[in-house]
């Protein structure tokens, strides 16, 4: 069977400027007290913005806007309605793999006729009580994805992975990606960072183990061929149609995959 090159959907977000930069510059010769007040007011507004919003989980997308980082896990939550259109019944039993999986599981469980589970690859000691309740109920597991996943083959209709693979070396990708495909019956959706996107700072390296590696679409396509994966045509086309209609504007690379038969 001829192998199809896997396409990706992406859109690089427009840059923005810090809203208080002009004010601080114009007041540079004012009294030190006024300058300090402006800085404090700006900081309070940003912190309030980052932690506001509906839902029991803080939005990592909003936090990323403040810190300058970008999270593909936040993208997953934005893309859920479009993924449901693309996969239909394939969204019955979903496994999400990646950092902050509790927030994704929470969003998925709000969808009708959708069951959801998550694998958190990193420590969750700082997680809130709602996330820890997911762990106690078995909806979320903390597991090192460098090793086999604790699930039987085709346990889930769809597996969605975000952010986690960007921190793995090719050595471990060769083991982890086939594992993701093994536990999925209808396919795997990979949300990967774009080259040039900012990710983990030095302070976070102790958690992730290594800096994020933002790989190009061509790199991923070669890798998929090597690991016997191909584009999942039908849902990929539906997803692209939704993007072309403006229903969703991805800021990460999105790959729709299935095993090569």
Curated annotation (Swiss-Prot):
Subcellular location: Golgi apparatus membrane
All ranges on the Lumenal side of the membrane: 57-261
Topological domains, Cytoplasmic: 1-35
Tree of life domain: Eukaryota
Enzyme class: transferase
One Gene Ontology term of the molecular function aspect: methyltransferase activity
Membrane topology designation: Single-pass membrane protein
GO cellular component assignments: chloroplast thylakoid membrane; cytosol; endosome; Golgi apparatus; Golgi medial cisterna; Golgi membrane; plant-type vacuole; plasma membrane
Carbohydrate-modified residues: 174
Keyword Kinase: no
Enzyme Commission number(s) of this protein: 2.1.1.-
UniProtKB keywords: Cell wall biogenesis/degradation, Glycoprotein, Golgi apparatus, Membrane, Methyltransferase, Transferase, Transmembrane, Transmembrane helix
Membrane-traversing stretches: 36-56
A GO biological process held by the record: positive regulation of developmental growth
Main location: Golgi
Effect of a null allele: Plants lacking both CGR2 and CGR3 (cgr2-1 cgr3-1) exhibit severe defects in plant growth and development (e.g. shorter hypocotyl and primary root length due to reduced cell elongation, and abnormal pollen tube elongation), as well as reduced levels of pectin methylesterification associated with decreased microsomal pectin methyltransferase activity. The double mutant cgr2-1 cgr3-1 also lacks uronic acids and methyl ester.
Function: Together with CGR3, required for homogalacturonan pectins (HG) methylesterification in the Golgi apparatus prior to integration into cell walls, essential for general growth and development. Promotes rosette growth. Impacts carbon (C) partitioning, photosynthesis and respiration efficiency by influencing leaf mesophyll cell walls morphology and physiology; pectin methylesterification modulates both expansion and positioning of cells in leaves, probably by changing cell walls plasticity.
Family under the similarity heading: Belongs to the class I-like SAM-binding methyltransferase superfamily.
The protein's name in its UniProt record: Probable pectin methylesterase CGR2
Gene source species: Arabidopsis thaliana
């Amino acid at each position: 069977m001829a192998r199809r090159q896997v396409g990706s959907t992406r859109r690089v977000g427009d840059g923005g400027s810090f809203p208080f930069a002009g004010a601080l510059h114009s007041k540079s010769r004012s009294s030190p007290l006024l300058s300090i007040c402006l800085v404090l007011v700006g900081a309070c507004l940003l912190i309030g913005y980052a932690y506001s919003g509906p839902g029991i989980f803080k939005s990592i997308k909003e936090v990323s806007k403040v810190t300058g980082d970008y999270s593909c896990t936040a993208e997953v939550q934005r893309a859920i309605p479009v993924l449901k259109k693309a996969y239909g019944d394939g969204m019955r039993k979903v496994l999400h793999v990646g950092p902050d999986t509790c927030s994704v599981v929470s969003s998925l469980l709000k969808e009708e006729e959708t069951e959801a589970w998550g694998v958190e690859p990193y420590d969750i000691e700082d997680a809130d009580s709602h996330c820890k309740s997911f762990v106690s109920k078995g909806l979320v597991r903390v597991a090192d994805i460098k090793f086999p996943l604790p699930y039987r083959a085709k346990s889930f209709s769809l597996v969605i992975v975000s952010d986690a693979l960007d921190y793995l070396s090719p050595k471990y990708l060769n083991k982890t990606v086939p594992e993701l495909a093994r536990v999925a019956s209808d396919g795997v959706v990979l949300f990967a960072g774009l080259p040039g996107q900012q990710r983990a700072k030095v302070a976070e390296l102790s958690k992730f183990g290594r800096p994020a590696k933002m790989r190009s679409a061509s790199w991923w396509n070669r890798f998929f061929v090597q690991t016997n994966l191909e584009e999942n045509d039908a849902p990929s086309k539906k997803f692209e149609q939704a993007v072309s209609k403006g229903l969703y504007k991805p800021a990460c690379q999105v790959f729709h995959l299935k095993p090569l038969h």
